[in-house]
Amino acid sequence: MMLSPSERQDIDLMSVSKSFDDVLRVSKDMMEFMHRGIKVTLYPNGSVMFYHFTDLENGRLYADEVIGKARQDDNDED
């Protein structure tokens, strides 16, 4: 399942990856990590891909958590 924020983001994935647990791999184009036991890919524009997960309600909640953490950590770097 892929979810995208209503507002396009500009997330520095290399920078924010240091604050995420269970990062599987990261580049300037994507960050793969585990969140609540789910494999997730975050993209710089704020899109979030959940693998083998189809619960839309919880997906929106988890995407908000991920984007919120990434934005907070990205702003902390400024």
Task: Cite the ranges covered by each PLM segment.
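A broad, low-specificity signal marking well-ordered, structured residues that form hydrophobic/aromatic
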Residues: 1, 31, 48
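Short Lys/Arg-enriched alpha/beta "domain-start" segment
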Residues: 1-25
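A structural detector for beta-sheet-dominated domains
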Residues: 4-6, 34, 43, 51
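A common structural junction motif
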Residues: 20-24, 66-74
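A short, structured beta-strand/loop element
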Residues: 25-39
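Short, compact, well-ordered microdomains
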Residues: 39-68
